[in-house]
Amino acid sequence: MSASPAERPAGLSVFFPAYNDSGTIASMVIRAVQCASELTSDYEIIVVNDGSVDSTPQIVDELARTYSHVRVVHHPKNRGYGGALQTGFRSATKEFIFYTDGDAQYDPAELADLWAKMTPDADLVNGYKISRSDPFHRIVIGRLYHHIVSLLFGLTVRDVDCDFRLMRRTIFEKIDLEKTSGVICLEMMKKITDAKFRIAEVPVHHYHRAYGKSQFFNFRRLGRTAIDVFKLWFALVIRREHQKAGAVTGQPHAR
């Protein structure tokens, strides 16, 4: 596929937040290189190694030596999923930014479907899972989470928490990301919605996690997430801090 948004060559940044993904990150990066090179000649692949303690750092450094379009940003210590996303958005230099996780539960080749949907009438193309290939309890918790936060935050997208997104970098001239935990996705979608950016949606496949384990689905993390969601709801829905004058800095940053 050679066509690009607005029927002209466009720059594309692809990034992966990676934490202990040594079993999957190489295949994800190689697949992303193959897909991105078919979409545009102006692309970069970025891996944000979020303080991994397995062989992820060595693997991604070798990928960067092998592929000229690949570069790596290392966090000396784990900053959390939100911290890794913030680094990825800051590091991206191209007109369009795509990200997904490094655990191979999504296929980077489906970026082509999002790219085709990125017309002049869209600012963000959000993937939504056709079906979720997870254990039953994770599916139930995921659906409950989606319905609860959609109601609390007034969101209408089909899948708030699908980390398979293509967006214009101009979005970050108007929104500022602050969260370092997994609720950064909720923060991002709420702020994008409130800033009146145009959202398109595309179905994507979700695959069984063949390597490693989720950092989200344990009771301690679920409790922490509930607290983070409440704090975010109070800040964005009750106080509407992001819509007050001077609240937008235009750069994602950690707090």
Tell me the role of every PLM-derived stretch.
Residues 21-24, 52, 81, 107:
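Donor nucleotide-sugar binding loop of glycosyltransferases
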Residues 23-27, 54-63:
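Acidic helix N-cap motif at the loop->helix transition within catalytic regions
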Residues 41-52, 73-75:
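Short beta-strand/loop segment that forms part of the nucleotide-sugar
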Residues 49-58, 104:
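A conserved acidic beta->alpha catalytic loop
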Residues 73-91, 96-99, 105-182, 207-234, ...:
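Acceptor/aglycone-binding surface of glycosyltransferases and processive sugar-polymer synthases
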Residues 171-175, 181-198:
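A short, conserved alpha-helix in the catalytic core of glycosyltransferases
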